[in-house]
Amino acid sequence: MNPFKGRHFQRDIILWAVRWYCKYGISYRELQEMLAERGVNVDHSTIYRWVQRYAPEMEKRLRWYWRNPSDLCPWHMDETYVKVNGRWAYLYRAVDSRGRTVDFYLSSRRNSKAAYRFLGKILNNVKKWQIPRFINTDKAPAYGRALALLKREGRCPSDVEHRQIKYRNNVIECDHGKLKRIIGARLGFKSMKTAYATIKGIEVMRALRKGQASAFYYGDPLGEMRLVSRVFEM
C-alpha cells in the first residue's frame, strides 16, 4: 500500500521536510520558509501533519538498518525530561559505550513499570546473543527491579550484570544534550501521542547521523537521503 496515496505533494518533498525537521533544531514555520525558497508553498500546519504521519513510519522502516550493534558493547541507560502539555514526561534512552543508539521509550511516569517496559522493548528487538554482559544505569532502584523481573521471566540472561557507576553514564548524558538541543526548538508537545511520533523521527535521524546505517551508504555523501527514500519504495 502506498503511504503517500492521495497526498497533494510529491513523496520526495514530504520526506525531505520530515527528515530535515527531525534532524535539525528548526521550527515548522522555519521549515515552511525554507520550502518556500525552493518553490514549494506549503503551510506549517501541513508539515506538522506530515511529521505526525511519516516520522513514526520512517523509524519503523529504518529500524532494521540502525538496529542494535552486535559487538556486545555495554549498554548505558538513563532518562531525560520532555515537556508535554505543560508537564514533564520521561524519555527513557539507551546507548552503547560508543554512543550508538540502542532504543528509547517515552513514558508519563518514572517508576519501575516504565523501566520494565523500556527494558522489555529493547529485549524484544534484539537477539539474545546481542545482549551485552553489562548494563549500566544510575542509582535509581527502578532499573534493578525491572532487570530482576525480566531475568525471572527468562527474557533477560541471568548472567547480565547490572552496574550503577555514575561516571560511566557520561556517554548517555552527553547524548541527551545533543538530543535536547534538537527538541528544544519545539517548545514542548501538546500530547504524548504527538510527542512520541516526533521523537521517533528525531531518534532515528540521530542514529543515522551517528553512522549506524552507514554500511548501506556505500560511501555516498547523499546516502542518508537515498536510504530514507529507498525504504519508502518497498
Predicted regions span which residues?
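Basic, short loop/linker segments at the boundary and entry of helix-turn-helix/winged-helix-like folds
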Residues: 1-23, 39-43, 48, 66, ...
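Short, basic alpha-helical nucleic acid-contact segments in DNA-binding proteins
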Residues: 49-70, 153-154
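Helix-centered, glycine/charged polyanion-binding patches within enzymatic domains
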Residues: 139-203, 207
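C-terminal domain-tail junction helix/linker
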Residues: 197-234
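DNA-recognition alpha helix
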Residues: 27-40
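Short conserved beta-strand segments at catalytic cores or DNA/RNA-binding microdomains
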Residues: 85-101, 111, 119-123
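Mobile genetic element proteins and their domesticated derivatives, centered on retroelements
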Residues: 17, 31, 47, 77-78, ...
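Active-site beta-loop-alpha junctions of metal-dependent nucleic acid enzymes
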Residues: 53, 104-128
